[in-house]
C-alpha cells in the first residue's frame, strides 16, 4: 500500500518522447499587427514570426529576442541565419523549393556545414498543411484546426505537431514559416 501512496514522477527521458503541439494564429494576445504567434496548449506564447518585408522575416522567442532571420533569395530559395534581420550571423540552413505541381509543393532543407542530413517538406501551403520528413520518419506536421460539425474550416489557425527527435523546436517553426510563405 505504501507504493500506491508515493507520488508519480515521470522520467525526463519519457517526456522527451512525447509529441509537442504548438498552435499558430495571428490573433494571440501580445502579438503586433501582422505577426504570427505559436502558442502551447495553455495559450502561452512560445514563438513569434515577425514580417519585416515580403522577403525578410524574424523568428523571436516569447520575450521578443531574435532567434533567426529568414530571408528569401530567388527562385524559391530561403536562408535561415542566427540573429535578427540587421545582424545576420551564421547560416543555419537553406530551403529550396524542388517541386510545385498544382497546389502541392515540395522543398528540400539543407543544413549548413552538414551534407549528411537533409530534410524534405511536402504539403499544400494554401491549406496550411505540410509534413517535414527526415529520411523515413516524420519530424513535424501541420494541420488546420477542425471542429465537429464545422462545414467551413478557417485557415487562420493551425496546429503544428513536433515529434520527438533531435531537431530544435525553433528550427521546425522556422521551416514551417518558410514553407507557408513559399
Curated annotation (Swiss-Prot):
Q: What is this protein called?
A: Protein LURP-one-related 7
Query: What's the stated role of this polypeptide?
Result: Might be related to the phospholipid scramblase and tubby-like superfamily of membrane tethered transcription factors.
Q: List the disulfide bonds.
A: none
Family of this protein = Belongs to the LOR family.
